[in-house]
């Protein structure tokens, strides 16, 4: 009799600690912050990512896109990411230099790539993967490189 009570008590405790999968779970919310307008290539890509994440996960993941520095200003975003206040960014690569990964500053040099094909050979190959891995010790996981246009110079002559 005592053993039966003990078994029943343990079973009840185990059941109480087990989450019920039949109960609707809240979606995972990812805050995606960037500093450009909605209608720019980066802004449109962020919106598309949010849409596809919702579709592919059947609503289990919801991506909230905060454009135009509405959530954090340009200089605040990286710190917010490291603190977990946002989960995704689409920063310019120059933002990783102050984080201690100076190799990313290479991409700010003018005329380093002649065209997008050369750029993609670097960013989508072993060099790009190596650069993204350098972010991990800083508490940041680099997922991919997004094109942000080439630097241009102009002058009054």
Regions found by a protein language model. Give the residues of each.
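Bacterial N-terminal signal peptides
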Residues: 9-18
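Short, polar/charged alpha-helical segment
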Residues: 39-64, 126
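Short helix-initiation/N-cap motifs at beta->coil->alpha
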Residues: 65-79, 148
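Contiguous mixed-secondary-structure segments that line small-molecule binding/active-site clefts
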Residues: 50-51, 79-82, 87-88, 92-157
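Bacterial N-terminal signal peptides that target proteins for export
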Residues: 1-10
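N-terminal glycine-rich cofactor-binding segment that shapes the pocket for flavin-like pterin cofactors
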Residues: 28, 62, 69, 73, ...
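Immediate post-signal peptide segment of exported/extracytoplasmic ligand-binding proteins
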Residues: 20-33, 54-62, 136
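Extracytoplasmic "Venus flytrap"
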Residues: 31-48, 68-73
């Amino acid at each position: 009799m005592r053993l039966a009570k003990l078994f029943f008590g343990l079973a009840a405790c185990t059941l109480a600690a087990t989450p019920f999968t039949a109960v609707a779970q809240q979606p995972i919310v990812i805050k995606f912050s960037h500093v450009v307008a909605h209608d720019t290539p980066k802004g449109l890509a962020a919106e598309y990512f949010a849409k596809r994440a919702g579709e592919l996960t059947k609503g289990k993941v919801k991506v909230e896109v905060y454009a135009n520095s509405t959530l954090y200003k340009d200089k605040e975003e990286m710190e917010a990411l490291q603190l977990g206040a946002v989960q995704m960014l689409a920063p310019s690569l120059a933002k990783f230099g102050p984080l201690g990964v100076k190799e990313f500053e290479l991409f700010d040099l003018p005329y380093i790539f002649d065209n997008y094909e050369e750029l993609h050979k670097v960013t989508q190959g072993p060099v790009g993967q190596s650069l993204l891995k350098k972010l991990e010790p800083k508490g940041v996981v680099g997922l991919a490189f997004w094109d942000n246009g080439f630097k241009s110079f102009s002058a009054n002559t």
